[in-house]
Structures are given as structure tokens and as C-alpha cells.
């Protein structure tokens, strides 16, 4: 419950892994798994993130979600606070960025189960993240969920300081 007595809005915490390559900032984005996302690309990619309970520290949740979705622990190092954004459906995403490197070919995501095909009565298991990829900031802005694009701009500003 929120302090006002109502239900707390859904909140997610995420961690953007970034690196500088050839003078350009690159970010590691993830693509959601499952049949509903299989043919979507532009606007479908995201930072590794997930919901967390009210009693969990958001940065700890971001690090946990990174490990769950990529199968690799979040890198140690300074976490740059990128603030919050509100997604279209109202979910608030708080994010941090950490410098590091990860080979996208090595990711192993946690999974989820859903009925597929719809109304078939059969369930299938799918990876929460079906792939990860490094993008320069300009291409990342085209691929990422539009509500999360502000996080990329904040990262650019933080790195340029």
C-alpha cells in the first residue's frame, strides 16, 4: 500500500550496462521473449529490469533483475542514478547505469510459462529475454521502448560530464 492507503503503482528497477567503444557510448539492451514479441523490433527492446516488492532496495532489485534476465551477475562499479520514467501503462521504471562488458552470446535468461497458442489449453515455457545486443545511443533510441529513451539521454549527459 502507498502512504495514502491506495495500492502502490507497479514499479520496476533496471540496470543499463554501458561501454565506450571507438569514442561512442554503447548500451546493452534486451529483447523480450515469447510469441507476443517475436516479430516486434523497433520500440520493443528494453533495459534489463523487473518489478520489485516495496521492501526491496531498488538498486539491489535492479542488480537482481540483471542477473535473472542475463544469467550473469551485474558488474561491480559505480552505479549512475538515471532517475525514473513512467511507461505508457503507468509503470514507473527507476534505472541505474554501470560500465562493463558482456558477450550477448552468453546470456541465459530466466523463463516464464504462458498458454500458447491462445485458448489452446496448452502451456509453453519461454525465455523472459530472447536476446541481448549492444547498440550505439542513436540506434538504441530507435529500438528501445519509447518511454525508456529518456534514460539513454540521461546516460549520455552523465558520461559527458
Task: Spell out what each predicted region is.
Residues 47-82, 136:
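The catalytic Nudix box helix
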Residues 2-47, 96:
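N-terminal strand-loop-strand
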Residues 133, 137-161:
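Charged phosphate-binding loop/patch that engages nucleotide di/tri-phosphates or the phosphate backbone
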Residues 22-24, 34-37, 53-54, 89-90, ...:
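Short, charged/polar surface micro-motifs in flexible loops or helix N-caps
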Residues 122-138:
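Alpha-helix-centered segments that form part of catalytic cores
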Residues 39, 55, 143:
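Residues that scaffold the ATP/ADP-binding catalytic core of kinase and kinase-like folds
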Residues 84-121, 133, 155:
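Active-site-adjacent beta-strand/loop module that shapes the phosphate/pyrophosphate-binding cleft
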Residues 3, 80-87:
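Short, solvent-exposed loop/turn elements at beta->coil junctions and helix N-caps
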